[in-house]
């Protein structure tokens, strides 16, 4: 949700021209022989373990170390690489996510409950943070075993960060490619269910591509379907899909609601046609309650608010339709929660829902490039008590709170087979 991004992205994304020259493959373009050849091209890679350096979530700065074995040698994982574009590699391995996580935890040996350890594949210190996909067993139970996230900056855990060569958002003020000071809602859901999360969401994304490098949800679906084809024993029916987008379309790109409805419907059609059965959907929050709209006209606020309300009715209708068809659909009313969260934060354990925790006093995407101090009120109370981290995006405490509400027994998600 970054306003007036085109000039900034031109400077930020040196790989954008490469992306334009290398169109993303579709699953139909990957032959069975290429799949077999790729899977047989076995190699190994190293694991980069990231962690928060501070004991407080008020400080999002991170650092990393190579994962090591108990004898001090470098820990490696066997598998194979594949990519649809030159800089977006994924490493497929039979090593489980739990084994990799445990090796990172043992290597770092941190007595820090807020370390928020995460890990990526990397061949050398100059590599990007590449996703590690753990292949499924040939014999697997009929239950959810992973989460796939599609969407925008509310779900992005590092894609735009990689594309900007680790500069956007600034890692000293935003947590390692997250538009927050820590984990986002999809990560909290995955952790609560002890499942790996695979992120296709991109900060700034709309339903369709914007400015070359901002991969829209339509192309995110294409990318997911293509990468999934290279995975061994993968069953889409055993994946929980999260889908949230639309705010960028209305706030930043002035797209009409009919266009966004079409993108949303197409994403669900393509996913279900590919075998997806389990979905976590959400209504859009009223973005005009975010601090950035202190700097907007009432006309702009009314226009965006009306679009959000209309889009939410469509999302509800889509959820009802697919549920009637027998799909496992959980629709969480994020809009209703944010209404009470922003109007009465104290009732939810927060103290401030009108100001950002970071000391930012304008609405400008340029600010994502800089390091910012905390607002004095946030420094006093702690980021855990603020609803918003910057002028647009929630704190990790808000993300965690929303995820907890999603996981409550009163919601359908609690009834899924995990």
UniProtKB/Swiss-Prot annotation:
SUPFAM superfamilies named among the record's database cross-references: SGNH hydrolase (SSF52266)
GO:BP terms for this protein? killing of cells of another organism; lipid catabolic process
Pfam hit, one: Lipase_GDSL
**What positions constitute the catalytic site?**
153, 390, 393
- InterPro entries (UniProt xref): GDSL, GDSL_lipolytic_enzyme, Lipase_GDSL_AS, SGNH_hydro_sf
PTM annotation: There are two forms of LDH. The LDH(S) may be a protein in which 13 residues of the N-terminal of LDH(L) are deleted.
Instruction: Tell me where in or outside the cell this protein is found.
Output: Secreted
Q: Name one GO cellular component term.
A: extracellular region
Q: Where is the signal peptide?
A: 1-19
Which key words are in the record?
A: Cytolysis, Hemolysis, Hydrolase, Lipid degradation, Lipid metabolism, Secreted, Signal, Toxin, Virulence
Q: Which GO terms describe its molecular function?
A: lipase activity; toxin activity
What does the sequence similarity comment in the record state about its family? Belongs to the 'GDSL' lipolytic enzyme family.
Q: What is the role of this chain?
A: Phospholipase hydrolyzing both fatty acid esters of phospholipid, i.e. it hydrolyzes phosphatidylcholine (PC) to lysophosphatidylcholine (LPC) and then LPC to glycerophosphorylcholine (GPC).
* Protein name stated in the entry: Thermolabile hemolysin
Source species, please? Vibrio parahaemolyticus serotype O3:K6 (strain RIMD 2210633)
């Amino acid at each position: 949700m970054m306003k007036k991004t085109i000039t900034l992205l031109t400077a930020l994304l040196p790989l954008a021209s490469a992306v334009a020259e290398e169109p993303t493959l579709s699953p139909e373009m990957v032959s069975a022989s290429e799949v077999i050849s790729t899977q047989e091209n076995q190699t190994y890679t190293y694991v980069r373990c990231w962690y928060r350096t501070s004991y407080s979530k008020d400080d999002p700065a991170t650092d990393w170390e190579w994962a090591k074995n108990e004898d001090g040698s470098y820990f490696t994982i066997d598998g194979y690489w594949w990519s649809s574009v030159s800089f977006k590699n994924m490493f497929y391995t039979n090593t489980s996510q739990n084994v990799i996580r445990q090796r990172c935890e043992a290597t770092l040996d941190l007595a820090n409950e807020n370390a928020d350890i995460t890990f990526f594949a990397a061949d050398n210190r100059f590599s990007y943070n590449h996703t590690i996909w753990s292949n499924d067993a040939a014999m697997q139970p009929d239950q959810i075993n992973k989460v796939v996230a599609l969407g925008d900056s509310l779900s992005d855990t590092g894609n735009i960060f990689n594309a900007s060569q680790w500069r956007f958002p600034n890692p000293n003020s935003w947590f390692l490619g997250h538009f927050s000071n820590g984990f986002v809602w999809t990560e909290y859901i995955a952790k609560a269910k002890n499942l790996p999360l695979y992120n296709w969401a991109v900060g700034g994304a709309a339903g369709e591509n914007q400015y070359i490098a901002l991969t829209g949800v339509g192309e995110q679906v294409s990318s997911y379907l293509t990468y999934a084809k290279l995975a061994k024993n993968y069953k889409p029916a055993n994946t929980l899909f999260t889908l949230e987008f639309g705010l960028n379309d209305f706030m930043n790109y002035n797209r009409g609601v009919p266009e966004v409805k079409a993108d949303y419907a197409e994403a669900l059609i393509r996913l279900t046609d590919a075998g997806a059965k389990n979905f976590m959907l959400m209504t859009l929050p009223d973005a005009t309650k975010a601090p950035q709209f202190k700097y907007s006209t009432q006309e702009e606020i009314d226009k965006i608010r009306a679009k959000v309300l209309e889009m939410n009715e469509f999302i509800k209708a889509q959820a009802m339709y697919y549920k009637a068809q027998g799909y496992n659909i959980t629709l969480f009313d994020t809009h209703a929660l944010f209404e009470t969260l922003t109007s009465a934060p104290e009732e939810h354990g927060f103290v401030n829902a009108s100001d950002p925790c970071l000391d930012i006093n304008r609405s400008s995407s340029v600010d994502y490039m800089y390091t910012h101090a905390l607002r004095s009120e946030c420094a006093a109370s702690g980021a855990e008590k603020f609803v918003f981290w910057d002028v647009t995006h929630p704190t990790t405490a808000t993300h965690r709170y929303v995820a907890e509400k999603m996981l409550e027994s009163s919601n359908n998600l609690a009834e899924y087979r995990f």
